[in-house]
Design a protein with these regions (language model features):
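A gly/proline- and charged-residue-enriched helix-loop-helix capping module
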Residues: 79-91, 100-106
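Active-site neighborhood of phospho(di)ester-bond hydrolases with catalytic His/Asp-centered motifs
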Residues: 20-23, 40-48, 76-77, 189-194, ...
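Active-site-proximal loop/helix segment associated with metal-binding centers of metalloenzymes
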Residues: 2, 113-190, 194-203, 209-211
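Active-site metal-binding motif and surrounding structural segment of the metallo-beta-lactamase
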Residues: 24-75, 99-104
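Short, surface-exposed connector motifs at secondary-structure boundaries
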Residues: 14, 40, 66-71, 242-249
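Metal-dependent catalytic neighborhoods of phosphoester/phosphodiester hydrolases
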Residues: 55-62, 84-87, 258-266
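Binuclear metal-ion centers of metallo-dependent hydrolases, dominated by the metallo-beta-lactamase
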Residues: 107-108, 197-288
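Conserved beta-strand hairpin/beta-sheet module of binuclear metal-dependent hydrolase folds
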Residues: 1-35, 69-71, 132-134, 180-191, ...
Length: 288
């Protein structure tokens, strides 16, 4: 539909940004977000249908014009190298390197990007497709009394908080000696172009935010979604409920679905904290 942009989700944390999918014109949406371009450090592709990848050349050229020089990491299922090679024919000379990381299509995989843990899991679509979770893990609180009781020199406390192991005068100090139980971090999961799958439910477990496709709103169109390997609203809601997510955003609507809000109750009947996504929708998630 003319008023809807193609697929992309932008995640920002700790001075870096990560993009999931890059539909045509994604650079326009990023410009409207007002977060700049140079801190984009990675793009995660769910799969290689055009509405999820065709925006890559334009975005790469926009990043170059913005003065980006740091490497850009591209993650995706098998076929990543061939797709990127083809799309970058019209963006051949970039002032930054592209680092490609092909992810397995039939098993989970975890990558680390700074403080961010990126986990992929198989989705169920017509071609190899992945769902992603982005997680900031949080260590337990520092216990000064425990550190003092074990006579750990104060100059090592901050290093132990960062997870280092330290040798000192024949003794070994590690973070487990001074940190409590791990605290809840922040987790966002993204799934599009898939039938409901157990692998996605496990990936999304305990997410603060689950962004999931709902190609059709009404349950009567389920057979059509099955044939195209997509989900309807109520199926996305069941996934959110099964995964014990805190909030569900629906996205990736069929062009035939003019007003997603007309059918939002089909999802809310299953998972009450469901919202119909729209272009530019955003949320800030903080540690508890």
């Amino acid at each position: 539909m003319p008023e809807r942009r193609l697929t992309a989700l932008l995640y920002r944390t700790g001075g870096q940004m990560v993009l999931i999918d890059c539909g045509e014109g994604t650079q326009v949406g990023l410009k409207l977000a007002g977060w700049g371009f140079k801190s984009l450090s990675a793009i995660l592709f769910t799969h290689f249908h055009a509405d999820h990848v065709a925006g890559l050349p334009g975005l790469l050229l926009t990043l170059a014009n913005a003065g980006k020089t740091e490497p850009l990491c591209l993650f995706g299922p098998p076929g990543l190298e061939e797709v990127v090679r083809g799309l970058t024919v019209i963006a051949p000379a970039l002032p930054f390197d592209l680092h490609l990381c092909k992810l397995p299509e039939e098993s989970n995989c975890t990558q680390r990007l700074g403080e961010l843990f990126i986990q992929s899991a198989p989705a169920d679509h017509r071609i190899p497709c992945l769902a992603y979770s982005l997680e900031i893990r949080r260590a337990g609180a520092f216990d000064a009394h425990r550190a003092q009781a074990q006579e750990i020199p104060i100059e090592y406390w901050s290093r132990l908080q960062k997870g280092e192991t330290i040798w000192h005068q024949g003794r070994v100090f590690d973070s487990g000696m001074v940190l409590g139980e791990s605290r809840r971090g922040i987790k966002v999961t993204y799934c599009t172009d898939s039938r409901p799958a157990g692998s996605v439910a496990l990936l999304a477990r305990d997410s603060d935010l689950f962004v999931c496709e709902g190609i059709y709103g009404e349950d009567e169109k389920r057979d059509g979604a099955v044939g195209k390997k997509h989900m309807i609203f109520s199926e996305a809601a069941f996934l959110a409920k099964e995964s014990r997510c805190r909030e569900l955003w629906l996205t990736h609507y069929s062009p035939s679905l003019k007003d997603p809000l007309e059918y939002i109750d089909c999802a809310r009947a299953v998972f009450p904290n469901t919202k119909a996504g729209f272009d530019g929708m955003s949320k800030t998630i903080c540690f508890e």
